[in-house]
Amino acid sequence: MERVSERSLSENLRRSDREDGKIIEWEEFDHELTRLWSLSSAMKLATERKQILQPKLESLIQVSTESLRRTNELEEMRQRLEARKLLVDKTSVACKVTEQDVKKKEENLSTEVRSLLVGGTTLSIAKSKLQESNCQLEGESGYAHLKIVTNKLRKRQQFMVSQVSFIYPLKIEAGPSQDQELESFPGGSRLGTKPLSQGSVRILGLPFSMAPFTKMSFFTDKKEVQKSATALGYVAHAVSLIAPYLRVPIRYPLCLGGSKTYIRDYAPYIEPSPSDMSPITTLSQNINFVEFPLFLDGQDTTRAAYAVFLLNKNIEQLLNFVGENSLGPRQVLANLKELIRIIQSPDYIDYL
């Protein structure tokens, strides 16, 4: 209502201003004066009302401004709160992942701790066993006692081999008038001197030659062949005695028969004939072997030469057992002599 009155008052004033230029009749002067007076009173009343309403409007404007400012602040705070909520959610997810990782690591750590405890227990047991072993080594059944027993065993082996050497003496034919025993070979090494030829070595006074075994002819001396077969029988018997003394199972077993000795091969390089095959039955399977003759009486020279090769391999096996190598693939007597010499040497007792 106040605004409507103000508008009407302003319109009346504008009208009065337009009418200032009019000529007023005297009769109408009172009427106009009354109208002007009423307009002035209305304007004064409107001004007073304006002055009264102005503080109220200003206060309302301030309240509205403050409300708007606070609304904006609340909106900003709400946005910050939403951002904090998102950050809290992300942090919560990360905490859950970290918690799961921590649980897994705790499980792994507990497993490792258990393994460590088991390892510590095992280590403690091993340490106790080691201490017991050290006590045993230092005691009567220790290394010193083992060494003493080993020395006694080696001396016994030397004695037994010396008996074999006494039964089957090996000599070198040094000249037409004298023989030199192989035991008197000079030399600083365990091998002694270089091996001599097969014809210069004799076993129990009998020589051995590979010539009949490599090439048999009509003019071959039968006595030489028989002596070689007998010498090989002696060598085979000596090897069959020495091998058990050393506790070495020879690779190619021997069937002793003096000058008619055979040697067995379970994997022959020569294809055998059906008549040569001899079966041996074991608990699990049948194993066939071939016997090769160590003599030439009615035998194939190739098979006999192969038998000599196998016999030399047995001697080489014994040489390797005592830490030496063979003197040669055909040095049967020299290899046997070298084996006996090494076993009878003082260094053999301390050989490990």
From Swiss-Prot:
One of the record's GO cellular component terms: cytosol
Subcellular location field: Late endosome membrane; Endosome, Multivesicular body membrane; Prevacuolar compartment membrane; Cytoplasm
NAD keyword on record: no
Keywords: Auxin signaling pathway, Cytoplasm, Developmental protein, Endosome, Membrane, Protein transport, Transport
GO molecular function: phosphatidylinositol 3-kinase binding; phosphatidylinositol 3-kinase catalytic subunit binding; retromer complex binding
Tissue-level expression: Predominantly expressed in the shoot apical meristem (SAM) and in the leaf vascular tissues. Also observed in roots, pollen and flowers.
Transmembrane segments: none
GO terms for biological process, alphabetical: auxin-activated signaling pathway; multivesicular body sorting pathway; protein storage vacuole organization; protein targeting to vacuole; regulation of auxin polar transport
Membrane topology: Peripheral membrane protein
Effect of deleting the gene: Multiple aspects of auxin-related developmental defects in leaves, embryogenesis, cotyledons, silique phyllotaxy and lateral roots in addition to unflattened and small leaves associated with an altered genes expression profile. Altered morphology of the VPS29-associated late endosomes. Enlarged multivesicular endosomes and reduced level of organelles enriched in PI3P, associated with abnormal trafficking of vacuolar cargo and its receptor VSR2 leading to erroneous cytoplasmic distributions of endocytic cargo (e.g PIN1 and PIN2) and seed storage proteins (SSPs).
Broad class of the protein's primary localization: membrane
Functional note: Dispensable for autophagy but essential for efficient targeting and degradation of biosynthetic and endocytic cargo to the vacuole. Required for seedling development and plant growth as well as for seed storage proteins (SSPs) vacuolar trafficking. Controls multiple aspects of development by affecting late endosome morphology and by regulating vacuolar and endocytic cargos (e.g PIN1 and PIN2) trafficking and distributions (e.g. polarity), thus influencing auxin transport orientation.
Subunit-structure text: Component of a complex made of VPS38/USL1 and PI3K main subunits such as VPS15, ATG6/VPS30 and VPS34. Interacts directly with ATG6/VPS30 and VPS34.
Protein name listed in UniProt: Vacuolar protein sorting 38
Lineage: Eukaryota, Viridiplantae, Streptophyta, Embryophyta, Tracheophyta
Gene: VPS38
